[in-house]
Amino acid sequence: MAKESYKRDKPHVNIGTIGHVDHGKTTLTAAITSVLAKQGMATLREFSDIDKAPEERERGITISTAHVEYQTAKRHYAHIDCPGHADYIKNMITGAAQMDGAILVVAGTDGPMPQTREHILLARQVNVPALVVFLNKVDIADPELLELVEMELRELLTEYGFPGDDIPIIKGSALKALEGDPEAEKQIMELMDAVDSYIPQPVRDIDKPFLMPVEDVFSISGRGTVGTGRIERGRIKVGDEVEIVGIKPTAKSVVTGIEMFQKTLDEGQAGDNAGLLLRGVDKNALERGMVIAKPGSITPHTKFKAEVYILKKEEGGRHTPFFNGYRPQFYFRTTDVTGSVTLPEGVEMVMPGDNLSIDVELIAPIAMEESLRFAIREGGRTVGAGSVTKIVE
């Protein structure tokens, strides 16, 4: 019967568990499903079931990710959990699992560890909007130590640009909750209340300003030029003004027709594969890699800072390191653009399997904003992935 209640009448939010290895991320994920399942809000997922996460490919990169869904009284959640540290890095950088917020799991017995730091930094770099902390294993931790751990955590979060003083820190034991201990189950509900109230409701794609990456271009004699692609966000109506951004100087146009599967529409929206007929645009003025967007909503850039992950040899990546001045292609949305890489001071070379911050200068401008994801390619083969962290010019 519980299955029936999975109607999409609640707002949807994507979250995930992050934190150091063995601090209890997967146990917590299982505990959340176990506690909510008792209220008919989830299907119980065993630890072992979540732990052997299936492999997926995202932008040519293999990532193991477990997907769990559940709901609270207020929201419907899709929750991701990764078995390995490298999977988290890849997930966050490729945006395979776009997180609207995350639960940072820290063992009260250990306090913040190196991967705790790395995950907080990554969450900051790839713009995860909000974090809630679950201080785990409090049943076996020294109470005085817990106070120190909490202080240290708040300082660490502040250091990385999160509001450390305001972030909810919920203390509990995921294992005890999973075993059905009533007090520990209450702590899980407390955590979910914090997630409900502290992680902001994301703006739905359809409510964002219109943007469609151009995949293909053709002309209809006597009517004009059509750009086709999948609408990434927002909605578009016949008669709307748009800008064509990237590669060449930005141009303005008006949408005079919208087609989907050979049918004409009045409106296209996020997720639709559509063809847009553009007034007064020459066929040569539109090409793959440009975007058609709401005027003023996005601008073209060539220089940016990025957080990147470089594939290991075993993942199909490079076999050798690269150095300052490396010139691969950067694949944004629908096209490759060559760019040169400047490494951070003190970094001589980058090995396959590394993740780091780099500066990039492209040979042609691309419609860009912070958090935009891209692949790094060499002759069509993916060798890395990245996320724009800051636009320089």
UniProtKB/Swiss-Prot annotation:
The keyword Cytoplasm applies. Keywords: Cytoplasm, Elongation factor, GTP-binding, Hydrolase, Magnesium, Metal-binding, Nucleotide-binding, Protein biosynthesis. Residues 173-175 are annotated as: G5. Residues 136-139 are annotated as: G4. It catalyses: GTP + H2O = GDP + phosphate + H(+). Its EC number is 3.6.5.3. Residues 19-26 are annotated as: G1. Residues 60-64 are annotated as: G2. One of its GO terms (cellular component) is cytosol. It is found in: Cytoplasm. CDD domains: EF_Tu, EFTU_II, EFTU_III. Monomer. GTP hydrolase that promotes the GTP-dependent binding of aminoacyl-tRNA to the A-site of ribosomes during protein biosynthesis. This is Elongation factor Tu. It comes from Chlorobaculum tepidum (strain ATCC 49652 / DSM 12025 / NBRC 103806 / TLS) (Chlorobium tepidum).
